[in-house]
Amino acid sequence: MSLALVYSRALSGMNAPLVEVEAHLANGLPHFNIVGLPDTEVKESRDRVRAAIIQSGFDFPAKKITVNLAPADLPKESGRFDLPIALGILAASGQINPEKLAQYEFAGELALSGLLRPVRGALAMAWQGMQAGRSFVLPQENAEQAAVMRGIAVYGARSLGEVAAHLNGIEPLTQTECKLPRRPSEQSKIPDLADVKGQHTARLALEIAAAGGHSLLMMGPPGTGKSMLSQRLPGILPPLTEDELVEVWALRSLLPNHQQQLDSNRPFRSPHHSASSAAMVGGGSDPRPGEISLAHHGVLFLDELPEFDRKVLEVLREPLENGEIHISRAARQAVYPAKFQLVAAMNPCPCGYLGHPSKPCRCTSESIARYRSKISGPLLDRIDLTIEVPSLSAAELMQQEAGESSAAVLERVTAARKIQYGRQGKVNAELSVSELDGKARIQKEAQEALGAMLEKLSLSARSFHRIMRVARTLADLAGEEEVNKTHVMKAIGFRRAL
């Protein structure tokens, strides 16, 4: 047989389109050519494949070898096609059984010794390949990642020789099994909310944000506990569901670091304020996920919010509304999920001490206005909760009584989320405008109070709907079916800090 077909997958954002690797051997001067819009890394695989085949004890055919990666208009990158190319050549030259090739999809980079090295996007490939009905053969390091997908068989191999022995029926590979962790990793120590003294309003806002999935902005002088509170938010969020786990791990598998710990911790990303737009939303010639996508189903914490470049902050507007980000480059486009919970912290002025009870502010009114203008109105309009975090007095700091623990708050948050999922199948922050009208259940008195405050404060329609979502969360935390006037007034109070 001089022609062989092997299945593999490329990466395009979270998608993994099917690639058919065709290997053809013909008489003529020995030559090895790869066609089908391969990247530089793929072209370099010729030398890796030749050395790996020889080092694995096989004969490299002294013929004219043509490898086609179809479809030709799909860009191909990285060394993931090394293994399928090598198997195609071995099958076309009659050194392995070609009949079993159609049952599997292959991916893996080859070392010169024939050993297999891990590749990016193993879980994303398995996620996309479930409907094809084929099994996967991957490097051992990638197999545990891909095996979390239910309903698909994944086999891990350490070398080209092991894969060939499996296909020839000499020594079958063992199917890889991976059990989904049901609890957050004990190795990751999430700080406890009991460490925070005082700040009852901020603690309540944090609980509301956790219960309804709302975004939160905290403003206050340096050292008042804004960052401390934010770092404790993951500790009062319920563990990831199984579907959420798969999405989070699929995104992690796209990173260059292939060895990712598989746990059910919600992501917590805290990029530095010098981060670029590409670092925040993703990008590059081969688009990779950015911080907002790596925070998918978790928390994105932006400390010193006005210090971020305004262009970087403005790119948050689309994902805050839609829960995904579209990246367009000259030759490639990618869509990544970005359903994150935004938590931000900032000082009230450049020096940080505006309104401080003992330290005077050194800023002019112009510098304060310029400082706050770095955060645009449309972005602020998309933040559900905005609170002030005041400095504590000496007596409050010296008190020995610990605050309420994260475990106690988590119980209330879990109960509120259970109500929301039972009523609408999602958290309140994700309710659309049409869903909000049917699910909010606002009392007539509360509607009248809300309408009066909207006119008085000149709030936008977006603010109106976000206030309704927060009020619905307050009612869920209280275990009440209807939103009353108290819930509405509290929700309005959480939007008046700026």
Task: Annotate each PLM feature.
Residues L112, L300-F301, E307-F308, A394:
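Residues immediately C-terminal
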Residues H297, D303-E304, V315:
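Walker B catalytic acidic pair
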Residues E207, Q261-L262, P267, A278-L300:
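Conserved alpha-helical scaffold flanking the Walker A/P-loop in AAA+ ATPase domains
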Residues P38-R46, P61, N68-S78, D286-P287, ...:
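Basic, amphipathic alpha-helical bundle interface domains used for macromolecular binding and assembly
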Residues F60-K63, K100-L101, Q131, R150, ...:
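Short loop/turn elements that form and flank the Walker-type P-loop nucleotide-binding site
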Residues M218-N257:
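Walker A/P-loop
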Residues M1-L217, P221-T224, S328, S463-F464, ...:
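Peripheral, non-AAA+ core regions of ATP-driven protein-machinery
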Residues D243, E247-M280:
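Clamp-loader machinery-focused feature within the broader ASCE/P-loop NTPase space
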